[in-house]
Amino acid sequence: MKNVVIVDCLRTPMGRSKGGAFRHTRAEDLSAHLMKGILARNPQVNPSEIEDIYWGCVQQTLEQGFNVARNAALLAGLPIEIGAVTVNRLCGSSMQALHDGARAIMTGDAEICLIGGVEHMGHVPMNHGVDFHPGMSKHVAKAAGMMGLTAEMLGKLHGISREQQDEFAARSHARAHAATMEGRFKNEILPTEGHAADGTLFTLDHDEVIRPETTVEGLSQLRPVFDPANGTVTAGTSSALSDGASAMLIMSEEKANELGVTIRARIKGMAIAGCDPSIMGYGPVPATQKALKRAGLSIEDMDVIELNEAFAAQSLPCAKDLGLLDVMDEKVNLNGGAIALGHPLGCSGARISTTLINLMEAKDAKYGLATMCIGLGQGIATVFERP
């Protein structure tokens, strides 16, 4: 089996879904811009040597339908000989794209792959056209299809208080804002054209979803949004709605050495796990345990961790059961997370992996973990190693 390495990773800024900079920019354009951008940063790589493009996207309809990966590749002017497939594992789609591309390289079916994902939640909302089979109610609770209610359930089971959630959300915004002000996102963001409030074109070079004014006190005034009578999860402690795309250029270690490109990280372990759909947010725990076992490592070996923040009520139980609560400030979501940056579904897996790799470089870390929950009860995890 061949070693798989990441030679570059990049993302668009996260645009606000409601009236944000990308309100007139299509998902295919965000993707095509990123595909061109990551290849422009790596002139040693001949695009014609790319075997396949794996691109995550959840709502594969409207502008994101009919294989958005291929549409974007054609818009980007990439060689028509390159294949392209759109991958859907709900929230874990672009991390699944990474796993799919990595396995193709490991088995020798490819030398170079381009992976990533996109979601324009402003143009194609998460619940657009959703039609669950009526018979599902015989197998899972109806609320299992309502992500906010699964977060409520998970939080209650683990005794997560409203105050803990508000503190976690405020931390996310504060850290993301600090990372922006200190230029820590600069290397991972590809400036992208958008529209200002007055409709004029401009280049967005930062995430516009972050709310630096967020405080625990302000969050405490918000009403529960999913269970108004008895709940604790609010809009402020849920991942923001945003539009964005992410990309990673991966290849075999032998190919990277042949081309003389810098190896930024190596894939050390990968895993998927299922869990009860009613507490879908718990998926990162079993997925991480499997990935670490396959990598021959422990959670203590991880120097930096990106745990996708679907909800504060979901992230905190995962952090607790993974033994991370005491090392949050040293290791976990050091540049904030999806509560501040948003969670464009098909984009997020490669986005958190991109942020992780940049953090690993900044901290001269050896090992890193990226993991996330997935709707209807799954988790996905990837362990990375710096050379």
UniProtKB/Swiss-Prot annotation:
Q: Name one Pfam family in it.
A: Thiolase_N
Describe the reaction catalysed, as an equation: an acyl-CoA + acetyl-CoA = a 3-oxoacyl-CoA + CoA
Pathway listed for it is: Lipid metabolism; fatty acid beta-oxidation
What's an example Gene Ontology biological process for this entry?
Answer: fatty acid beta-oxidation
Give GO terms: molecular function aspect only: acetyl-CoA C-acyltransferase activity
Q: Which GO terms describe its cellular component?
A: cytoplasm
Give yes or no: UniProt keyword RNA-binding.
no
Transferase as UniProt keyword: yes
Q: What is its EC number?
A: 2.3.1.16
Q: What class of enzyme is it?
A: transferase
Classification via InterPro entries: FadA, Thiolase, Thiolase-like, Thiolase-like_sf_Thiolase, Thiolase_acyl_enz_int_AS, Thiolase_AS, Thiolase_C, Thiolase_CS
Q: Where in the cell is it found?
A: Cytoplasm
Q: Which UniProt keywords apply?
A: Acyltransferase, Cytoplasm, Fatty acid metabolism, Lipid degradation, Lipid metabolism, Transferase
Give the positions the UniProt entry annotates as the active site. 91 (acyl-thioester intermediate), 343 (proton acceptor), 373 (proton acceptor)
Subunit: Heterotetramer of two alpha chains (FadB) and two beta chains (FadA).
Give the NCBIfam families listed for this entry.
AcCoA-C-Actrans, fadA, PRK08947.1
- Role, per record: Catalyzes the final step of fatty acid oxidation in which acetyl-CoA is released and the CoA ester of a fatty acid two carbons shorter is formed.
Give the family from UniProt.
Belongs to the thiolase-like superfamily. Thiolase family.
Which named protein is this? 3-ketoacyl-CoA thiolase
Record organism: Vibrio vulnificus (strain CMCP6)
